[in-house]
């Protein structure tokens, strides 16, 4: 867990909303229903990354990454139905990260760990969010511009770029 966020999740046998919670220092769940995907309830593991991001793993192998403000950054993974494919899981059971941002996911049924390397795009997003939160607006603005060059449809980049202009 990061010093800035505390996370918890409840494993449910039936569908429930807000199974994953992300608490700020005031104890408020910042994954409010309007920020959370209500259709996901089958979380099996959660871990925090080096920037305070939370990575949540579902039983179906979906991986969600939230920033420490509760915004969904990325989702990837999924269930392997009939054949083996990298990035898909038969029975995902655990998730962890190392200090370089590599994501490790255990597939219990297949008996191995898949490793996901952070992409340049993901690393740029992490750095831009970090710089913005630390008040490094000039540096953050440059990174947001690069992110928008790579993906002009990124909602988070548009919001981050706008915030960097408010210095």
Segments from the language model and where they lie:
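Eukaryotic scaffold repeat domains enriched in small/polar residues
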Residues: 1-163
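Alpha-helical linker/edge segments of TPR/alpha-solenoid repeat scaffolds
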Residues: 166-167
